A protein has these predicted regions:
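Pre-Walker A-like glycine/lysine-rich segment at the N-terminus of P-loop NTPase domains
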Residues: 1-35
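Short, surface-exposed coil-to-beta transition loops
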Residues: 75-81
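Post-Walker A helix-loop "phosphate-sensing" segment adjacent to the P-loop in P-loop NTPases
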Residues: 37-48
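Short, flexible loop/turn elements at secondary-structure junctions
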Residues: 23, 67-71, 84-88
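AAA+/P-loop NTPase substrate/partner-engagement loops
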Residues: 49-71
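A short, structural micro-pattern
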Residues: 59, 76, 105-107
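Extracellular structured ligand-interaction cores
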Residues: 16, 60-64, 79
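Electropositive, glycine-dotted interaction segments
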Residues: 85-248
Length: 249
């Protein structure tokens, strides 16, 4: 399915976009998809529970997200997609005698970042920036050289990081190893804005309240997620808000 979360009305200072539907219509599936997105953009492992949601008749699920990154210079339209599947976890076992004792994990693979760009003076049609569906670190080669350079040692380091990310149910594109190399080598502000904007969004601007919070509500408090800036840095977190009494923050 596809859902557009863009507010097409006037640019209010604050607005609410609602999603309504019958039981079983997929409302919770949307929240789960956003939860996976936040984990991936934040460089965290995706729990097995999300891979368990993949249809039994399907080998994997493909998730696609489209972002609009606006700056005074112009607008990047960015598409980020990846596949999610359930696979055997060999990291926590080296011998299995009972087939029922096999452990599983999530796996993120076939990541792809595409972009287009529009400004008053320039239009760039949609093209691929990063595609991990290759034995190398990522393709296409022209973009690899722009983002990372030509040092073969960097290629080796990224291939190792790619395998480590796969083995720990994390994104390779948003792993700390890839981002560190990207920040060291990429001199293009144009491409840096794309990747760094997605990283910032996942860490500091995307907040997801899942059904697991229902237990907190039943206990009389609601987790309040927040973001604030101090000393040039951005911090996020959550604090419990009582549903029965006045709160002082």
């Amino acid at each position: 399915g596809e859902l557009v979360l863009k507010n097409t009305r006037k640019p209010y200072k604050a607005s609410v976009l609602g999603l309504y539907g019958q039981n079983g219509s997929g409302k919770t599936a949307l929240i789960d998809a956003l939860s996976i997105l936040k984990l991936v953009l934040s460089g965290k492992s995706v729990p097995l529970q999300y891979a368990e949601y993949v249809n039994l008749e399907a080998d994997n699920a493909k998730l696609e997200f489209t972002f609009s990154i606006t700056s005074p210079q112009g607008t990047h339209n960015v598409e980020y997609s990846f596949n999610l599947r359930k696979c055997r976890n060999d990291n926590e076992q080296n011998m299995v005698n009972d087939k029922n004792d096999v452990r599983y994990m999530s796996r993120i693979y076939n990541e792809c970042v595409k972009y287009s760009y529009h400004s008053d003076t320039e239009d760039i049609p949609k093209q691929t920036l990063i595609d991990t569906k290759t034995e190398k670190a990522f393709a296409p080669g022209t973009k690899y050289r722009l983002l990372i350079g030509n040092d073969p040692n960097d290629e080796t380091d990224l291939i190792v990081e790619k395998r480590m990310a796969s083995a720990s149910a994390r994104s390779f594109v948003f792993s700390s190893g890839f981002l560190k190399k990207f920040k060291e080598k990429c001199e293009s502000e144009f491409y840096r804005q794309i990747i760094e904007s997605l990283v910032f969004y996942g860490n500091y601007e995307l907040f997801v309240i899942t059904t697991s919070n229902s237990g907190h509500i039943a206990m009389g408090y609601l987790p309040l997620m927040f973001q604030y800036e101090e000393d040039g840095g951005t911090r996020t977190g959550n604090i419990p808000i009582s549903l029965n009494d006045a709160n002082y923050i």
